[in-house]
């Protein structure tokens, strides 16, 4: 969706427009990625995969008219936002409001002759799902591309342990609620202690 780019100091169209990706998965991607892989394994053509929660894709106004849902939220178009910053602010308000709902609506935004479609998110993970997600053999190391470079933030988080996902906040300086959702999903005590033990060994 239309967003402010700090480096270029201007509003940019949705990432789908510039990347030309077939689909984007937003937020924490375990559930949507599994759903996408399951559809592809069944042989569903990629062009027909439109309803997976927590995904976004490009469509056309004609196609969206045929697939309209009663509670769809139609944002001001990208072009309208370029002309009026208050319209962009109103769009952002809708996005924030939907991120605070357990049952959010689908969000649509016209950009030129295309429509960005953002499906609502999955419900928060259960404790068991979150435990399973943290049970993979993560290395706890920086990405290999840094090749021995000093990463000051890594020193701070090297031994940190996530005990939950999500944040009900929405602080201007932080994007955790945008990435992880506004609802808290907690790990079990056993899962947390298992990770702490692994770090200390």
Where are the regions that the model predicts?
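Core AdoMet radical
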Residues: 1, 16, 178-201
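Flexible loop/turn segments at secondary-structure boundaries
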Residues: 1, 32-34, 126, 140-141, ...
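Glycine-rich beta-alpha loop elements in corrinoid/cobalamin-binding modules
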Residues: 1-112, 116-123
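Alpha-helix capping and helix-loop boundary segments enriched in small/acidic/polar residues
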Residues: 3, 24, 158, 162, ...
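Conserved, mostly hydrophobic/aromatic
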Residues: 22, 133, 167, 171, ...
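Short, charged low-complexity linear segments at domain edges
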Residues: 129-156
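N-terminal pre-triad scaffold of radical SAM enzymes
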Residues: 150-172
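Cys/His-coordinated zinc-binding microdomains
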Residues: 175
């Amino acid at each position: 969706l239309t967003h402010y780019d700090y480096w270029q100091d201007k509003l940019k169209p949705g990432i789908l427009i510039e990347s030309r990706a077939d689909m984007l998965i937003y937020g924490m991607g375990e559930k949507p990625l599994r759903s996408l892989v399951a559809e592809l394994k069944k042989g569903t053509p990629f062009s027909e995969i439109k309803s997976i929660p927590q995904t976004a894709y490009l469509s056309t106004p004609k196609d969206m008219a045929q697939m309209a849902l009663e509670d769809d939220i139609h944002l001001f178009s990208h072009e309208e936002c370029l002309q009026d910053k208050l319209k962009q602010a109103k769009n952002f308000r809708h996005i924030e409001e939907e991120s605070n709902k357990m049952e959010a609506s689908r969000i649509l935004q016209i950009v030129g002759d295309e429509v960005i479609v953002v499906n609502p998110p999955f419900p928060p993970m259960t404790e068991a799902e979150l435990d399973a997600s943290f049970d993979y053999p993560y290395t706890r190391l920086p990405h290999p591309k840094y090749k021995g470079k000093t990463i000051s933030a890594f020193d701070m988080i090297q031994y940190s342990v996530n005990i939950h996902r999500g944040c009900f906040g929405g602080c201007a300086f932080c994007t955790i609620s945008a990435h992880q959702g506004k609802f808290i999903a907690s790990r079990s005590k056993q899962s947390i202690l298992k990770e702490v033990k692994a770090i200390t060994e």
